[in-house]
From Swiss-Prot:
Listed Gene3D superfamilies: Ribosomal protein L33
Keyword Ribonucleoprotein: yes
Protein name: Large ribosomal subunit protein bL33c
Keyword Chloroplast: yes
Organismal lineage: Eukaryota, Viridiplantae, Streptophyta, Embryophyta, Tracheophyta
GO MF, one annotated term: structural constituent of ribosome
Main location: plastid
One BP term from GO: translation
């Protein structure tokens, strides 16, 4: 049986490739957007920011998605 309440928090993962492209191409052309994933994590087990390698349809490749503050 579960002990107490669940302390998992919602986490947003943002594509680091899209963010870098948006900063570098600010004047040249507008990017399609920034892709984000929603997931959960237990802050007691993983206090450091979460980074996962996921697919980004805007970059059309697998990139590192890092945790952002909401």
């Amino acid at each position: 049986m579960a002990k107490g309440k669940d302390n998992r928090g919602k986490v947003t993962l943002e594509c680091t490739g899209c963010v870098q492209n948006r900063v570098n191409n600010k004047k040249k052309k507008k990017s399609a957007g920034i892709y984000r994933y929603l997931t959960q994590k237990n802050p007691k087990n993983t206090p450091s920011p979460l980074e996962l390698r996921k697919f980004c349809p805007y970059c059309n490749k697998h990139t590192i998605h890092g945790e952002i503050k909401e």
